[in-house]
From Swiss-Prot:
InterPro entries linked: AAA+_ATPase, DNA_recomb/repair_RecA, DNA_recomb/repair_RecA_CS, P-loop_NTPase, RecA-like_C, RecA-like_N, RecA_ATP-bd, RecA_C_sf
Species this protein is from: Listeria monocytogenes serovar 1/2a (strain ATCC BAA-679 / EGD-e)
Protein name: Protein RecA
Database matches in NCBIfam families: tigrfam_recA
Gene name, Swiss-Prot/TrEMBL: recA
SMART domains found in the cross-reference section: AAA
HAMAP family with a match to the protein in the record: RecA
Annotated Basic and acidic residues bias: 325-335
Keyword DNA-binding annotated: yes
């Protein structure tokens, strides 16, 4: 047994000498066994994700129909990263980012890194350079469907380019996945949906870009509008369902229901009223909502308005709800501690 252990120790020393310290270790020796996360900017989504937010160093795919709220979900995450002192980058392959809307959601547009690349190859090379720097906490690519290969742009209309985009994504993700993990960057890929022709049974919907992104993603979120939110006859927003269809760090298939209001994004007060009522932090009796035996509004909209006006009570309720769901942020790391990450990337 001692000979076997000595041989193993010798092999480990050789591996570390050849590939660098930390290239192999016992799992129990790893200093951080908890999953480090950054809040999604939505309490309901943090709870649905099971770990209190997006896991750092992982790939996230957000997909759904047009105008369902995919970019809104990503922009809320960027705002949360910036609020914690982190750096975020947005690769706008669709050339459709609205800076005024992003600002309304809490994004610091003066500090947001923005790229509007001409080709898919250029977009993914920029993404790789940003991730390899080790200085970017969140990278959003909007969208995979708009990552057009160079050959397609330079070709004629009507030319067939079978599988080009899928091959591009497959190669890019092979290169990116390892360095994303080492740099602790959260990479959010926004994707659209398409329909297969001639599917008689089952779901005909597919996401563009091949299968690679499905495999490499730690979390996949499906965003869909459920119903319109009206004030009188005016449509003020949409009730949106965000389904966690894949999750490698917690149980999947949980659903977060949020109100996405036009011009404002996700209503924090709306989801807080729903989640607090679910765990009896807020009491609901008939149409009345009350907190600590004090009535805060008749009907959901009035309760939302009360919390909007009384931010101290809103923050207190939010803290209690997070404690009830055990997502008090204990696994989070400071975003400005980059020295170890940078040294790991320099070793490459």
């Amino acid at each position: 047994m001692n000979d076997r252990q000595a041989a193993l120790d010798q092999a480990l020393k050789q591996i570390e000498k050849q590939f660098g310290k930390g290239s192999i270790m016992k799992l129990g020796e790893h200093s951080d066994q908890n999953i480090s996360t950054i809040s999604s900017g939505s309490l309901a989504l943090d709870i649905a994700l099971g770990v209190g937010g997006y896991p750092r160093g992982r790939i996230i795919e957000v997909y759904g129909p047009e105008s369902s709220g995919k970019t809104t979900v990503a922009l809320h995450a960027i705002a949360e990263v910036q609020a914690q002192g982190g750096t975020a980058a947005f690769i706008d392959a669709e050339h459709a980012l609205d800076p005024a809307y992003a600002k309304n959601l809490g994004v610091n547009i003066d500090e947001l890194l923005l790229s509007q690349p001409d080709t898919g190859e250029q977009a993914l090379e920029i993404a790789e350079a940003l991730v390899r720097s080790g200085a970017v906490d969140m990278l959003v690519i909007d969208s995979v469907a708009a990552l057009v290969p160079r050959a397609e742009i330079e070709g004629e209309m009507g030319d067939a380019h079978v599988g080009l985009q899928a091959r591009l994504m497959s190669q890019a993700l092979r290169k990116l996945s390892g360095v994303i993990n080492k740099s602790k960057t959260i990479a959010i890929f926004i994707n659209q949906i398409r329909e297969k022709v001639g599917v008689m049974f089952g779901n005909p919907e597919i996401t563009p870009g091949g299968r690679a992104l499905k495999f490499y993603s730690t979390v996949r979120l499906e965003v869909r509008r459920a119903e319109q939110l009206k004030q009188g006859t005016d449509v003020m927003g949409n009730k949106t369902k965000i389904k966690v269809v894949k999750n490698k760090v917690a149980p999947p298939f949980r659903i977060a229901e949020v109100d996405i209001m036009y011009g404002e994004g996700i209503s924090r007060e709306g989801e807080l009223v729903d989640m607090a009522a679910e765990v009896d932090v807020i009491n609901k009796s008939g149409s009345w909502y009350s907190y600590k035996e004090e009535r805060i509004g008749q009907g959901r909209e009035n309760a939302k308005q009360y919390l909007k006006e009384h931010t101290d009570i809103r923050d207190e309720i939010s803290k209690r709800v997070r404690e009830e769901y055990e997502i008090d942020g204990s696994s989070k790391e400071p975003l400005d501690e980059k020295e170890e990450t940078l040294s790991l990337l320099d070793d490459e």
